[in-house]
Amino acid sequence: MENLSERFNVLQDQLMNIYESAAETLESQIEHWQILRKEAVLLYFARRKGVTRIGYQPVPTLAVSEAKAKEAIGMVLQLQSLQKSEYGTEPWSLVDTSAETYRSAPENYFKKGPMPIEVIYDKDADNANLYTMWKFVYYVDEDDNWHKSESGVNHTGLYFMQGNFRHYYVLFADDARKYSATGHWEVKVNKETVFTPVTSSTPPDSPGGQRDPNTSSKTPTTTTDSASRLSPTASREQSQQTNTKGRRYERRPSSRTRRQTQTRQKRSRSKSKSRSRSRSRSLSSNRRSRSKSRRKASTTRGRGRGSPTATSDQSSRSPSATSSTTSLRSRGSSRVGRSRGGRSRVGRSRGRGKRSRESPSPTNTKRSRRQSGSSRLHGVSADAVGTSVHTVSGRNTGRLGRLLEEALDPPVILVRGEPNTLRSFRNRAKHMYRGLFSSFSTAWSWVAGDGIERLGRTRMLISFVSFNQRKHFDDTVRYPKGVDRSFGSFDSL
């Protein structure tokens, strides 16, 4: 207990020295976050040991200490990466590198130079809202290179330039739906009107604009810090879901037809059974000879009408009907034998003999199934790859057949989130989940059709060899917080 108190007091003294010096260097800010990490680890250890208070300092719960330690580790890694860039020599204060500033809009970016932006709704000075625009925003590109960008404001919202693209982090149209009755607002910078009153329906194709006030909730927005807003990809996913639902509904008539045919076969069997029973009761020795002659005639007619190939095809196509009629005949003959007393054994033996001669053998049925299934094992042509739109069934297909079926529809996972979060997830997956995926794409975004604004959040594609591999990946991998996913497939990768 005394050792914990001494170490905790030492960390507090180091923090006080940093606060009093107020050095504006990245070295000092990295040291500050290192001390905060040590403090969180110490409090976590104390809580594990059952200590609830160190001096006058109450010990937080394990979850709080763990979250603070992880936050400190993440900030140290980001600051160390920034220190290696050309912007590492710039002045950086405690406010610039604080967690609150880092998490404010735009989230997960270092920024400097806050400026207040006032937006007045419905030309009412009392109905106004204040926003913070940052003069400079620092971001990392796909090659882990740091860039410094200037932020700006227009009638649509607040943005910063990411190359040649405008990355909006505040959209005025979103708050106009809450605070405005007419959908009009004006933007003021330093109490000067920069943009005259505009309506949310004026720029229909711009980020945050509306085409119709009744369908405002369905229109895609371009903000990057909100997970609940729809993007163009989300709308396409909804349309794909509706298409797949339509395709699923199309399968039902075929299943109903099979059920109808089965019921018809059952009815015909029951009718034939009743007829055979009535006939078997009134059969005599003369009618036995007639039935034998009829069977011989039907046999000769079947051979004379069609070729042996056609006969074998008919027998293979309708094994159920042949077996049912054969069993009925055997039942009739056996019952006649039983009525005669002494000839009951003969009747039974005749029934068994007819079953063995006329019923289709199970080996023939298996051969026909193998012949029909062997066509699936010849491979998939290049033109057929990606043509399947249904999930592969695991029934009546071997391992090779399933792989060939899955080749028709290469699966992917689309993940959406912040660019830095997706890159970290990609790097972690390459080391921890190797073999569970085929490849990762770079981080990318949609671009407006009539502008250069980036739409929605950053995206990344993950490709797989098969659906089983994608399912195993999705069940095993733990996605970062704020990252959502959706499934899909392509004709080719």
Swiss-Prot record:
List keywords of the entry alphabetically.
Answer: Activator, DNA replication, DNA-binding, Early protein, Host nucleus, Phosphoprotein, Repressor, Transcription, Transcription regulation
Molecular function via GO: DNA binding; DNA-binding transcription factor activity; nucleotide binding
Entry's localization field: Host nucleus
Source species: Human papillomavirus 19
Pfam families assigned: PPV_E2_C (PF00511), PPV_E2_N (PF00508)
Q: Where is the composition biased (Polar residues)?
A: 229-244
Provide the residue span(s) of the region labelled Disordered: 196-395
Q: Where is this region: Transactivation domain?
A: 1-201
Main role?
Plays a role in the initiation of viral DNA replication. A dimer of E2 interacts with a dimer of E1 in order to improve specificity of E1 DNA binding activity. Once the complex recognizes and binds DNA at specific sites, the E2 dimer is removed from DNA. E2 also regulates viral transcription through binding to the E2RE response element (5'-ACCNNNNNNGGT-3') present in multiple copies in the regulatory regions of the viral genome. Activates or represses transcription depending on E2RE's position with regards to proximal promoter elements including the TATA-box.
State the residue spans of region: DNA-binding domain.
Answer: 409-493
For this entry, the protein name equals Regulatory protein E2
Listed GO biological process terms: DNA replication; DNA-templated transcription; regulation of DNA replication; viral DNA genome replication
In the UniProt record, the gene name given for this protein reads E2
Q: State how it assembles.
A: Binds DNA as homodimer. Interacts with protein E1; this interaction greatly increases E1 DNA-binding activity. Interacts with protein L1; this interaction enhances E2-dependent replication and transcription activation. Interacts with protein L2; this interaction inhibits E2 transcriptional activity but not DNA replication function E2. Interacts with protein E7; this interaction inhibits E7 oncogenic activity. Interacts with host TAF1; this interaction modulates E2-dependent transcriptional regulation. Interacts with host BRD4; this interaction mediates E2 transcriptional activation function.
